């Protein structure tokens, strides 16, 4: 069953381009926007991640942290971030989880458990309260 409004989000640790990330440790007492994207180097995802980077200072003023994921590797993320920064005139410095094993995507319902092993995560967004509940 997928996560629903009001559910406590499960904690996880996963690799990112910034090193290992533990969700609860990363979140602390902040709100968190966790969003997934299907794949690195896609035009729509490039503009979305660039826009999140541009808005991030405003979100931080409101105690909101951002984190994203895809089933690509941390090395792929690092290369793609250079493209995002160049084409979107911004600096992506928030974590992009490298969910190549699909563990977090499946845990959060971003990929159906019976989906093909080649299927990527769908675009999905969770806004989580400081209490770790989905709103």
For each predicted feature, which ranges?
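Chalcogenol-based redox active-site neighborhoods
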Residues: 1-127
